[in-house]
């Protein structure tokens, strides 16, 4: 679907939403500068996307209902700035990260996004299953930072902070659990971040920044929360997607210009782990450090104070100690 087609369908939807009565095909054709046949084709395309639009001969069109999905033509008008070059998807897919990876390998530009309201094969860090039920916002962004691989280690933190800022604008406050989770104040998970990429030698070729946000429901009520629950009412998925994408774009561009140092203090102020007793393990389950979280450094490493000193952690699984 081209951006021009999206733009015309946005105009049609806005006209239908703004009118208390049927909108004639003739009026829509005049506003768009196209034929009534072209208008009918756009209406048919909107039907395929899940919009219910009544058409009555001699009267016109009425919008009955809209799909509960972060569709590109709903999200794009809400975005600020010019970072996002291309938006795809919006409904159900296996994995937005897989889709975005395929686009990146085909040469898709930075700022290409794949959106979905449900994933059937979502995954988290280390290939773990990531429950992605219907009514969520799942977005994967193609990034092409001109940096060497070690510099990109902090990107999960930058993206996570961008997501937190985006949710702030919706009135949803979250805390950051290093390295890739966003939690509500009681420790339940609201969103997660997964970055995957390809490097050529020391240089990054591309990175896919994947984000999943619980909006309608939480997969596990004891361990996760939803935006709707925290906000107190039903939040349009397009609004959540646009807020999150805007937050990521601003944070990413600041990181490109100034590195991670300007983010360190804000990240610590939003840290769920600050001052808590934790155990950090590697992928094989080996304990890397146990002690109190002292913060993060300018390189994005988690600092854990043990009985013998402070251990900087580059990567690992963090669990709270109960003892």
Put a short name on every predicted segment.
Residues 2-166:
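N-terminal lobe of the biotin/lipoate ligase/transferase fold
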Residues 3-4, 8-12, 31, 110, ...:
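Catalytic beta-strand/loop module used to bind and position nucleotide/cofactor moieties
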């Amino acid at each position: 679907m081209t951006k021009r087609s999206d733009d015309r369908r946005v105009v049609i939807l806005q006209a239908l939403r703004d009118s208390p009565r049927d909108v004639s095909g003739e009026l829509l054709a005049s506003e768009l500068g196209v034929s009534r046949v072209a208008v009918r084709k756009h209406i048919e395309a909107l039907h395929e996307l899940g919009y219910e639009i009544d058409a009555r001969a001699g009267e016109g069109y009425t919008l009955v209902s809209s799909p509960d999905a972060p569709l590109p033509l709903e999200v794009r008008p809400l975005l600020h700035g010019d970072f996002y070059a291309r938006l795809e998807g919006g409904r159900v897919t296996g994995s937005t990260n897989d889709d975005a990876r395929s686009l990146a390998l085909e040469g898709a530009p930075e700022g290409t996004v794949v959106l979905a309201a449900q994933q059937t094969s979502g995954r988290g860090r280390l290939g773990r299953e990531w429950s992605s039920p219907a009514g969520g916002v799942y977005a994967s962004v193609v990034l092409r930072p001109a940096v060497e691989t070690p510099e990109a280690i902090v990107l999960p933190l930058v993206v996570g902070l961008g997501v937190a800022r985006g949710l702030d604008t919706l009135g949803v406050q979250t805390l950051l659990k290093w390295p890739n989770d966003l939690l509500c104040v009681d420790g339940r998970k609201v969103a997660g971040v997964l970055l995957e990429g390809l490097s050529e030698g020391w240089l990054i070729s591309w990175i896919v920044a994947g984000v999943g946000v619980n909006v309608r429901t939480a997969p596990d009520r004891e361990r996760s929360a939803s935006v709707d629950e925290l906000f107190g009412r039903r939040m349009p998925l397009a609004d959540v997607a646009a807020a999150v994408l805007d937050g990521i774009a601003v944070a990413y561009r600041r990181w490109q210009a100034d590195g991670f140092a300007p983010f360190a203090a804000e990240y610590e102020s939003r840290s769920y782990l600050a001052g808590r007793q934790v155990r950090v393990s590697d992928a094989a389950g080996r304990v890397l450090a146990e002690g109190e979280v002292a913060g993060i450094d300018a390189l994005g490493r988690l600092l854990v104070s043990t009985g013998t000193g402070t251990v900087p952690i580059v990567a690992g699984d963090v669990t709270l100690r109960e003892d």
